[in-house]
Amino acid sequence: MMKGKVMARAGLDKNVVVEKAAQLANKMGIDQIQLKMLAESLSIQPPSLYNHIRGLDDLRRELMIYGWKQVEKRMLEAAAGADGYAAWEAVCRAFYQYATENPGVFSAMLWYNKYQDKETQGVTEKLFSICFAITSSLNISEENCNHLIRTFRAFLEGFCLLVNNNAFGHSLSVEESFDLSLKVMIGGMKELEGK
């Protein structure tokens, strides 16, 4: 290698960088990730990361997008073959499972705003489409579907955040609490049929 030059590692691309960052985030927490640490885990020099990301803030944004793409894939798979309230429940459970299995990436996902720019708008396009298809099949209006997406997002993200931070201290099963909460939430959805 020529002095002063940083050679790119063969096979290294943005996807590899983001996936390695996701592994580190899940293991150590998103706030613990530093570019030097990420570079070392990839066996490259820190300046080489700038061939793929613009810095730490950009890396966090990429992790947010990565997480939403991953969770969208899981939720769409969960909804396949189900319909109505069973499909809605399936996508909620898929979100919960992904978020609690990937706590570091989930932390990056929390501040996602679909309307921030074109890239973020495209990230969950299929997911929103399936949500609208499910609620439409239940005779729930598009306006109320938007309210439901916000409501369930707040419930799911809040519940998962508490689980990931071990904030439920009672000995009752967290899984049972989630099941009950989801049942109550879906019961409330039924009040919106025809509205």
What are these regions (language model features)?
Residues 114-151, 176-187:
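Amphipathic alpha-helical packing segments from all-alpha helical-bundle domains
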Residues 50-54:
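Base-recognition residues in the alpha-helical recognition helix of bacterial helix-turn-helix
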Residues 76-104, 142, 149-152:
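Hydrophobic alpha-helical connector segments
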Residues 108, 154-171, 186-195:
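Amphipathic C-terminal alpha-helical segment
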Residues 16-23, 27, 41, 58-78, ...:
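Alpha-helical structural segments
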